[in-house]
Amino acid sequence: MPELPEVETALRGISPYLKNFTIEKVVVRQPKLRWAVSEELITLKNVKIVDLTRRAKYLIIHTEKGYIIGHLGMSGSVRIVPQDSAIDKHDHIDIVVNNGKLLRYNDPRRFGAWLWTENLDDFHLFLKLGPEPLSDEFNAEYLFKKSRQKSTALKTFLMDNAVVVGVGNIYANESLFICGIHPLKLAKNLTRNQCYSLVNTIKDVLRKAIIQGGTTLKDFLQPDGRPGYFAQELLVYGNKDKPCPKCGGKIESLIIGQRNSFFCPKCQKRG
C-alpha cells in the first residue's frame, strides 16, 4: 500500500507536468473504484490546474473550479505518459492536459478513489484527520496529550489518522524500533521523553523515505517508472528471523490490528 512518502513522491513527480496546464478532458474507463468516480470529474473539460498538494495520503489537484481528490488505495499508481501511449491492463483513468501528456491512474485492486469537491474545508474525508507528521503541529507535547487515557497498542495509536496522518505500517515499525519501544506498549504509558524521541524519529524516517523516493515492496513505482529505494534501508520491517541490526538477536513478528508488526524483543522491551 502506498504510504505518505510514496504519495509525496508521486506528487512531486507529476506536478511539473500538470501545474499551470489545462485539463482537456478526463477519460474514465472504470468508474467503480472504492467509491464511484465523481460525476463532476467525468465531465470535467477545459479547466486550468493551478496547484497540486497533498493531505495525508490524498493527492489534491487544485483547479479553477474545484478540487480533484485522488487516493491510490492498496495498489494504485499514477504516471505521466504521452497522450498516444498504449493502454495497459488496469489503466482506469486518464486526466488529459494540453501539453501532449496525460496523468494515468492504474489500480489492479480498485481500492483507490477519484473524487471532486468545490470546498476543501468541508470535504468529508478530511474533517477528522489529524495533523501532518512533518508539520510543527505534530510535536512531543501534542503526542503526549493525545496519548493520555488511550489503552491501545502504541503502534495502532500511531497509525490512527485521527492522531496523526500518514504514519503507515512500514514507518511505524521502523520508528518504534529506532526508539526502542515495543509496539504493544500502551499509548497512555508513553513518557514525555519517549514522545519527544518518537516525534523526531517519525519525522526523520519519513523525510529519508521521501528523499529516496518512497518504499518499493510490491506495487509502488514512481511516476517515471523507477522504483523507490527506501526498502534497502528497512531495519525491521519484513525482516522476521533475521538478525537485529542493533544487538544481533532475532527479529520477531506478530499481528497488531490485523497488520504485521516487526520488532526486536531484546531492544524493544514491553512495558
Curated annotation (Swiss-Prot):
Alphabetized GO MF terms: 8-oxo-7,8-dihydroguanine DNA N-glycosylase activity; class I DNA-(apurinic or apyrimidinic site) endonuclease activity; damaged DNA binding; zinc ion binding
CC cofactor: Zn(2+)
Reaction equations catalysed: Hydrolysis of DNA containing ring-opened 7-methylguanine residues, releasing 2,6-diamino-4-hydroxy-5-(N-methyl)formamidopyrimidine; 2'-deoxyribonucleotide-(2'-deoxyribose 5'-phosphate)-2'-deoxyribonucleotide-DNA = a 3'-end 2'-deoxyribonucleotide-(2,3-dehydro-2,3-deoxyribose 5'-phosphate)-DNA + a 5'-end 5'-phospho-2'-deoxyribonucleoside-DNA + H(+)
Enzyme Commission number, as recorded: 3.2.2.23, 4.2.99.18
Keywords: DNA damage, DNA repair, DNA-binding, Glycosidase, Hydrolase, Lyase, Metal-binding, Multifunctional enzyme, Zinc, Zinc-finger
GO process terms (BP): base-excision repair
Residues binding DNA: H90, R109, K150
One Pfam assignment: zf-FPG_IleRS
First and last residues of each zinc finger (FPG-type): 235-269
Record text on cofactor binding: Binds 1 zinc ion per subunit.
Record has Membrane as a keyword: no
Active site per database record: P2 (schiff-base intermediate with dna), E3 (proton donor), K57 (proton donor), R259 (proton donor)
Assigned protein family: Belongs to the FPG family.
Alphabetized PANTHER family for the sequence: FORMAMIDOPYRIMIDINE-DNA GLYCOSYLASE (PTHR22993:SF9)
Known function: Involved in base excision repair of DNA damaged by oxidation or by mutagenic agents. Acts as a DNA glycosylase that recognizes and removes damaged bases. Has a preference for oxidized purines, such as 7,8-dihydro-8-oxoguanine (8-oxoG). Has AP (apurinic/apyrimidinic) lyase activity and introduces nicks in the DNA strand. Cleaves the DNA backbone by beta-delta elimination to generate a single-strand break at the site of the removed base with both 3'- and 5'-phosphates.
Assembly description: Monomer.
Protein name: Formamidopyrimidine-DNA glycosylase
Organism expressing this protein natively: Haemophilus influenzae (strain PittGG)
Gene symbol of the encoding locus: mutM
